[in-house]
């Protein structure tokens, strides 16, 4: 079968391959070998930021850099170029009489996109730009394809997501955003590690989807001839570790949900879940606030965070309000009073709140009211707590009012950023809630989970009172990088 890739070479690609062959003929490996640099562009700019042209000439310091050739100009015996490394770009100044004829030819024949190593004197041009006056140039790797025309800022959205490497080369803003993402995750780890939490890894392949209400991806294990699912949450395995005595655990991992895609949803995404023995949801509220404020401070500094023109007071204590009070504040409807399911449905109809066919409890109506009227008002960081039992199958009932649970969700800019509760550690209650979920599944609720008997058995060995938390890392990264779509914080988002 002919190689279609080879048949489609355009003129530029042919010329680049010819140059590759010419390098090989000269005894130069077109794809280079190990190269030792002494500094990055950023380190040089930082080190010599306050040095004038004259001072640099007097110091006469040399440096060796390496990176991708991004611009090149000049003719005859003198040339200027920009080399790009992980910190950004730095100019190089190449003179034929300084590097020698053979070495100057390597520079002259280099194409944009090629990798070069440059050794030379640190200087400042008459225009004040910090540069390297080359004394030697090393060819490090040949680029066989030219960079996209607009390499100063790739603008084609499809290419940005499909060929992230081109986006990273051409869009510094995008590159920096992903560096920030990594920093956010590192800071969260540092914060939890300092408080005695242990980072663990749990299985991605599960026998039964659990720990969340979501449709799973189903796969098949050939050797055991069993269907398995990709995890939709981290929860149930982490709580088994609390049973095992680990007391403080967390996991940062990929989650898979076979659901729709939009600006804030991708089929695979990153979550952190944290579990702390002997804590309740009030302690976990404090922990959540600490995690988010610590991450924000690390990448944004002290003070509020600006998101799409709105000032988010992330540095101040987060508001805390019961779900029923929040609904009452906005709609005037009081769900504190006892009511039948029929009365709740009548209220929903009166207020034009959709009632799904699988609803059988007042709690589901309360949650629907919250989603319909309250969520869109929650701009500043707000902990909404006291979710109904009907929508919280893994959370502990509130001892004062068992219709509700000791659970909270964190909302910022109308979106949910975290979900947490005092964990249900009563195996009998847990089994009955699993059974209710299984019944809802039978009634057509696609997101209801099945029964995890192994988890119930684990609880029967005893689990201490525990607080647990889940935070969507991608949404947090969107907030802290002022980004409107999840695809801009995922290096390789899911594409058709």
From Swiss-Prot:
UniProt binding sites for Mg(2+) 2: 416
Task: Cite the GO molecular-function annotations of the record.
Answer: ATP binding; catalytic activity, acting on a protein; lysine-tRNA ligase activity; magnesium ion binding; transferase activity; tRNA binding
Kindly list the cofactors needed: Mg(2+)
The EC class name is ligase
- Cellular compartments per GO CC: cytosol
Q: Which EC number(s) are documented for this chain?
A: 6.1.1.6
Name the CDD domains for this protein.
LysRS_core, LysRS_N
Alphabetical list of InterPro entries matching this protein? Aa-tRNA-synt_II, aa-tRNA-synth_II, aa-tRNA-synth_II/BPL/LPL, Lys-tRNA-ligase_II, Lys-tRNA-ligase_II_N, Lys-tRNA-synth_II_C, NA-bd_OB-fold, NA-bd_OB_tRNA
Could you tell me the Gene Ontology terms of the biological process aspect for this record? lysyl-tRNA aminoacylation
Classify the source by domain of life.
Answer: Bacteria
Subunit structure, interactors included: Homodimer.
Q: Which family does it belong to?
A: Belongs to the class-II aminoacyl-tRNA synthetase family.
What is this protein identified as?
Answer: Lysine--tRNA ligase
Provenance organism: Streptococcus thermophilus (strain ATCC BAA-491 / LMD-9)
């Amino acid at each position: 079968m002919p190689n279609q890739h080879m048949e489609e070479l355009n003129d530029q690609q042919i010329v680049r391959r010819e140059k590759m062959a010419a390098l090989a003929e000269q005894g130069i490996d077109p794809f280079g070998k190990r190269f030792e640099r002494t500094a990055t562009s950023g380190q040089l700019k930082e080190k010599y930021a306050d040095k004038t042209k004259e001072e640099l000439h007097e110091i006469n310091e040399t440096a060796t850099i390496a990176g991708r050739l991004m611009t090149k100009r000049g003719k005859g015996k003198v040339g200027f170029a920009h080399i790009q490394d992980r910190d950004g770009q730095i100019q190089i100044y190449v003179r034929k009489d300084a590097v020698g004829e053979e070495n100057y030819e390597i520079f002259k024949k280099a194409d944009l996109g090629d990798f070069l190593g440059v050794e030379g004197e640190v200087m400042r041009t008459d225009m004040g730009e910090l540069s390297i006056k080359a004394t030697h140039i090393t060819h490090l790797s040949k680029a066989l394809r030219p960079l996209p025309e607009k390499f100063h800022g790739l603008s084609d959205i499809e290419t940005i997501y499909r060929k992230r490497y081109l986006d990273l080369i051409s869009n510094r803003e995008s590159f920096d955003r992903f560096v920030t993402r990594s920093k956010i995750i590192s800071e969260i780890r540092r914060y939890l590690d300092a408080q005695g939490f242990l980072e663990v890894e749990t299985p991605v392949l599960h026998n039964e989807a659990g720990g969340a209400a979501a449709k799973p991806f189903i796969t098949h294990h050939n050797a055991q001839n069993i269907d398995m699912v990709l995890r939709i949450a981290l929860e149930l395995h982490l709580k088994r570790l609390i049973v095992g005595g680990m007391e403080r655990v967390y996991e940062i991992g990929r989650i898979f949900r076979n659901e729709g895609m939009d600006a804030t949803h991708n089929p695979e995404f990153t979550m952190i879940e944290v579990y702390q023995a002997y804590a309740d949801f009030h302690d976990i509220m404090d922990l959540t606030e600490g995690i988010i404020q610590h991450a924000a401070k690390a990448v944004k500094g002290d003070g509020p965070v600006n998101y799409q023109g709105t000032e988010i007071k992330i540095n101040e204590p987060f508001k805390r309000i019961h779900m029923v009070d929040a609904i009452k504040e906005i709609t005037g409807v009081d769900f504190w009073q006892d009511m039948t399911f029929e009365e709740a449905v009548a209220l929903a109809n009166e207020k034009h709140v959709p009632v799904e066919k699988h609803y059988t409890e007042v709690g589901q109506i309360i949650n629907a009211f919250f989603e319909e009227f309250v969520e869109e008002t929650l701009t500043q960081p707000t902990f909404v707590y006291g979710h109904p039992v009907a929508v919280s199958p893994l959370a502990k009932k509130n001892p004062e009012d068992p219709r509700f649970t000791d659970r909270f969700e964190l909302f910022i800019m109308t979106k949910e950023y975290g979900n947490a509760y005092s964990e249900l550690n009563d195996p009998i209650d847990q089994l009955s809630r699993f059974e209710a979920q299984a019944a809802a599944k039978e009634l057509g609720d696609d997101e209801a989970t099945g029964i995890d008997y192994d988890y119930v058995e684990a609880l029967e060995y005893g689990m201490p009172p525990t607080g647990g938390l889940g935070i969507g890392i991608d949404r947090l990264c969107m907030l802290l990088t002022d980004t409107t779509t999840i695809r801009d914080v995922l290096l390789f988002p899911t594409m058709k």
